[in-house]
UniProtKB/Swiss-Prot annotation:
Keyword Oxidoreductase: yes
Official protein name in the record: AM-toxin biosynthesis protein 11
Disulfide bond positions: none
Further comment: Gene clusters encoding host-selective toxins (HSTs) are localized on conditionally dispensable chromosomes (CDCs), also called supernumerary chromosomes, where they are present in multiple copies. The CDCs are not essential for saprophytic growth but controls host-selective pathogenicity.
């Protein structure tokens, strides 16, 4: 049996809410075991900046252009892709910064679904109370496919913008609408379909690990995902968010194993 491993790094804003009550089950094939290292920054929010956040990552690339593409560092022997979500001083925010991406990432690190109204988003209006819908596992939503790379609703369905590597190692952006427990997407450039299922109820959060040589605490969180698409590649969608107003950052990696 041969295993292929792809490593992605992500950065996202989230609230460090961890509930270790839910068991992690590995019963089906074609699932990915992902680990996130969640860190809380001790700097004051007003002192934080996008540039200072990149200093927390040891091996980084240049910030991604404003058209939504990102650059990767392939020097790692494990083909690690260190992603830096950047923002030019005069350019717009990364189009992957959406309320729904915040919501999905909060499901990855917490058992309960949270509202995303308390997150300020670059160049985006804060959704009203009639738009902020807490999507519980198993809840049905309608609507599908939205190639516009920013927050939108279709039939009261939040749309997630995400990215995927092609065979030329170029990152392309795609969109998805949530159906039940999964995210269904259809690629813009081909007829291939991709399904990414978020098992928000199957999350294990370990206790906080304190390193006396570090200035922050690290929370290790394990989450079960399902990721399958044509071409034999199992790539985890990158949910990127880079905002320092709350003083929280997430610096970690997603390790995807496929058989």
């Amino acid at each position: 049996m041969r295993w292929s491993e792809s490593v992605y790094s992500l950065r996202s804003t989230l609230k460090p809410l961890f509930q270790p009550d839910s068991p992690l089950t590995l019963r089906k094939r074609n699932k990915s075991l992902c680990e996130y290292n969640i860190r809380r920054s001790r700097r004051r929010p007003e002192e934080e900046s996008i540039q200072s956040l990149s200093k927390h990552v040891s091996t980084t690339t240049q910030p991604c252009p404003t058209d939504g593409r990102m650059m990767f560092d392939l020097s790692n022997p494990y083909h690690s892709s260190e992603t830096v979500v950047g923002r030019d001083a005069e350019g717009p925010a990364n189009p992957l910064d959406t309320p729904f991406s915040e919501f999905c990432f909060s499901q990855l690190v917490s058992n309960s679904a949270h509202s995303y109204l308390d997150f300020d988003l670059f160049d985006e209006p804060t959704p009203g109370t009639n738009q902020a819908q807490t999507i519980e596992p198993g809840q049905q939503t309608s609507g599908f496919e939205n190639p516009i790379p920013y927050h939108t609703h279709r039939n009261d369905t939040p749309i997630l913008d995400w990215s995927k590597l092609d065979r030329y190692q170029s990152l392309h952006q795609h969109s998805a609408a949530q159906f039940y427990d999964s995210l269904g997407t259809e690629q813009d450039d081909s007829a291939a379909r991709c399904t990414l299922a978020l098992f928000s109820g199957r999350i294990v959060a370990d206790k906080a690990e304190t390193n006396p040589f570090l200035i922050h605490k690290t929370h290790r969180t394990t989450v079960l995902l399902q990721n399958a698409h044509v071409g034999g590649r199992r790539q985890q969608a990158v949910l990127d968010k880079c905002y320092t107003g709350l003083g929280y950052t997430s610096l970690g990696s997603v390790r995807t194993k496929a058989r």
